[in-house]
Amino acid sequence: MPRFFCPAPLRTGDLLDLPAGAARHVQVLRLQPGDSITLFNHGPGWEGVSPCGEFEARVTLMGRSQVQVEIGAHQAVEREAQRAVHLAVGMPANERMDWLVEKAAELGVASIQPLMTERSVLRLAAERATKKVDHWQSVAISACEQCGGNRVPVKIGRAHV
């Protein structure tokens, strides 16, 4: 069953419009009204808003750029490690950082902190660093969707010296 990250509170019985990226993915998979998907949204800041785990959902409406789902039963699934692992890593070359974020998210790392060290190959200006953090966030979300993790390491910090 396809899994999608949904950055909104999830409650059983609610109707929800999927975010643009997830909606496009549902359309590419050629899902139809009545098909089932799995939603998750848990990351730091969601404690008390939505319970951790997964929600079954059923596609109810397919539009040109809109997909609406009805949220079903909650399943309290915890696939992450018992202890929080925080990863601090010196900035490698560009593609390697993408790979590192992907694998760290698959392993269940709680947070990733890039470090600008004396020998770092990659140097980022403030504006470019913000764009990179957003990109790494989307890489982490994709990795969690694929591997079955329910906690996205959204605490990807800005690079520190």
Predicted feature descriptions by range:
Residues 72, 76-158:
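RNA substrate-binding interface of SAM-dependent RNA methyltransferases
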Residues 1-76, 127:
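N-terminal positively charged helical leader segments and presequences
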